Amino acid sequence: MGQDNSTPISLTLNHWRDVRTRAHNLSVEIKKGKWQTFCSSEWPTFGVGWPPEGTFNLSVIFAVKKIVFQENGGHPDQVPYIVVWQDLAQNPPPWVPASAKVAVVSDTRRPVAGRPSAPPRPPIYPATDDLLLLSEPTPPPYPAALPPPLAPQAIGPPSGQMPDSSDPEGPAAGTRSRRARSPADNSGPDSTVILPLRAIGPPAEPNGLVPLQYWPFSSADLYNWKSNHPSFSENPAGLTGLLESLMFSHQPTWDDCQQLLQILFTTEERERILLEARKNVLGDNGAPTQLENLINEAFPLNRPHWDYNTAAGRERLLVYRRTLVAGLKGAARRPTNLAKVREVLQGPAEPPSVFLERLMEAYRRYTPFDPSSEGQQAAVAMAFIGQSAPDIKKKLQRLEGLQDYSLQDLVKEAEKVYHKRETEEERQEREKKEAEEKERRRDRPKKKNLTKILAAVVSREGSTGRQTGNLSNQAKKTPRDGRPPLDKDQCAYCKEKGHWARECPRKKHVREAKVLALDN
């Protein structure tokens, strides 16, 4: 093997795909360029003995990690890289030679001139008295089974060893008990993963349990949870959802559960929760039991001796957490008040699924019924239909075979109506068109009356033109009695041509006879 492959940094760069896979398994992201820069240029300046070619010496890695994780003057961007270095040293891959595993770096604590120590940082959160309710006795660690050492010649603390109380690594440094004992210039919680029970290595046996290490909740987490959630009496859903999530993700111990109850709930709320939880302890038949010995065994009020590194201890903790969540849900119920359930109405822009969730939460809070049970599906469905928005309610009531629809089917039908609703722009355009159509209908009678008036005026003007001898009108006249019109040289009296009526000889003869008769 050449010289280039004998240094830790060259080994990691030559097997970068394996290193990156290791980082992904640790839920962190690393870059090859930064990996080389931190190892060869940045960490050697910390003055803890880190060589530019890198090292797998755990004592040096822990020293660098302490500086990286410092609250004041730390290096958050370097956290993923030193975490992966530590994992490579604790769980070396096959391509790491034995000589690299046992390499010893001398003078690991030589200070570097020109790097003054950072001043102590003032506390972020106020020192409230409610965070000290369980300060005595301090949170355990319970006795943890240590994994076997990596190699007989390995130097540095084993991976499963509990940190010393004077070394404020890990989330415990943020708690009040650790903060009181830790020196001011050495504070810095390890915030990589803050879990009360954290896996610290591979199982001691091929089919054994993964060993867990205890890390108590930090005061910052407790303060944030208390400040950012309404009280349990005001809105039980907030804290119930929080604790249900914590029971699944953080795997709290019995002491952690008591600390959460002390910090987040009042005395009356805490008593109700514990009482409801003990009512929900399941017996051997899977139904709630009333046997005192089984209740005390599954949900003890005094601190039990459960070892979380054994299968029996983990099972006990799992049952305890599940029972505590059942107690939270039971204590969240109020006296039966169906009027409160009927007050839950769907908002104008509220999705049907969100409305259904609010409706079911009202059932859980104000009725003794479980809305998700099979027997309550019909009641919840009728309430969902009757209290939906008007357009959705109208659609659901017209469905054929409504009694055969499940709650999920009703939500799907409601979603169709909800997503077919017009947008704000479409609504404005529709209202504009409706207003224009209404204006046209209102103006239509006026236009009709105006047309009649204009027709009458035109007719009157035509009549006036005929009376004044308008030739154009005369030419267009047609005889009313059906007689043909006269020619221009035709007599109107005798109908002969060549003279007019005043010159008609027949008509003149008659007149002369009458005149002669008068003379006689």
Curated annotation (Swiss-Prot):
<dbReference type="GO" id="GO:0020002">
    <property type="term" value="C:host cell plasma membrane"/>
</dbReference>
<keyword id="KW-1039">Host endosome</keyword>
<feature type="site" description="Cleavage; by viral protease">
    <location>
        <begin position="195"/>
        <end position="196"/>
    </location>
</feature>
<dbReference type="InterPro" id="IPR036875">
    <property type="entry name" value="Znf_CCHC_sf"/>
</dbReference>
<dbReference type="InterPro" id="IPR000840">
    <property type="entry name" value="G_retro_matrix"/>
</dbReference>
<keyword id="KW-0946">Virion</keyword>
<dbReference type="InterPro" id="IPR001878">
    <property type="entry name" value="Znf_CCHC"/>
</dbReference>
<dbReference type="InterPro" id="IPR050462">
    <property type="entry name" value="Retroviral_Gag-Pol_poly"/>
</dbReference>
<feature type="zinc finger region" description="CCHC-type">
    <location>
        <begin position="489"/>
        <end position="506"/>
    </location>
</feature>
<dbReference type="GO" id="GO:0039660">
    <property type="term" value="F:structural constituent of virion"/>
</dbReference>
<keyword id="KW-1188">Viral release from host cell</keyword>
<feature type="short sequence motif" description="PPXY motif">
    <location>
        <begin position="139"/>
        <end position="142"/>
    </location>
</feature>
<keyword id="KW-1198">Viral budding</keyword>
<keyword id="KW-0597">Phosphoprotein</keyword>
<dbReference type="InterPro" id="IPR036946">
    <property type="entry name" value="G_retro_matrix_sf"/>
</dbReference>
<keyword id="KW-0862">Zinc</keyword>
<feature type="site" description="Cleavage; by viral protease">
    <location>
        <begin position="125"/>
        <end position="126"/>
    </location>
</feature>
<dbReference type="Pfam" id="PF01140">
    <property type="entry name" value="Gag_MA"/>
</dbReference>
<dbReference type="GO" id="GO:0044185">
    <property type="term" value="C:host cell late endosome membrane"/>
</dbReference>
<keyword id="KW-1187">Viral budding via the host ESCRT complexes</keyword>
<feature type="compositionally biased region" description="Polar residues">
    <location>
        <begin position="461"/>
        <end position="476"/>
    </location>
</feature>
<dbReference type="GO" id="GO:0008270">
    <property type="term" value="F:zinc ion binding"/>
</dbReference>
<feature type="compositionally biased region" description="Pro residues">
    <location>
        <begin position="137"/>
        <end position="151"/>
    </location>
</feature>
<dbReference type="GO" id="GO:0039702">
    <property type="term" value="P:viral budding via host ESCRT complex"/>
</dbReference>
<keyword id="KW-0167">Capsid protein</keyword>
<dbReference type="GO" id="GO:0072494">
    <property type="term" value="C:host multivesicular body"/>
</dbReference>
<dbReference type="InterPro" id="IPR010999">
    <property type="entry name" value="Retrovr_matrix"/>
</dbReference>
<keyword id="KW-0479">Metal-binding</keyword>
<protein>
    <recommendedName>
        <fullName>Gag polyprotein</fullName>
    </recommendedName>
</protein>
<feature type="region of interest" description="Disordered">
    <location>
        <begin position="419"/>
        <end position="489"/>
    </location>
</feature>
<dbReference type="Pfam" id="PF00098">
    <property type="entry name" value="zf-CCHC"/>
</dbReference>
<feature type="region of interest" description="Disordered">
    <location>
        <begin position="110"/>
        <end position="199"/>
    </location>
</feature>
<dbReference type="GO" id="GO:0003723">
    <property type="term" value="F:RNA binding"/>
</dbReference>
<dbReference type="GO" id="GO:0016020">
    <property type="term" value="C:membrane"/>
</dbReference>
<feature type="compositionally biased region" description="Basic and acidic residues">
    <location>
        <begin position="419"/>
        <end position="442"/>
    </location>
</feature>
<feature type="site" description="Cleavage; by viral protease">
    <location>
        <begin position="454"/>
        <end position="455"/>
    </location>
</feature>
<dbReference type="GO" id="GO:0019013">
    <property type="term" value="C:viral nucleocapsid"/>
</dbReference>
<keyword id="KW-0694">RNA-binding</keyword>
<keyword id="KW-0863">Zinc-finger</keyword>
<keyword id="KW-1035">Host cytoplasm</keyword>
<dbReference type="InterPro" id="IPR008919">
    <property type="entry name" value="Retrov_capsid_N"/>
</dbReference>
<dbReference type="Pfam" id="PF02093">
    <property type="entry name" value="Gag_p30"/>
</dbReference>
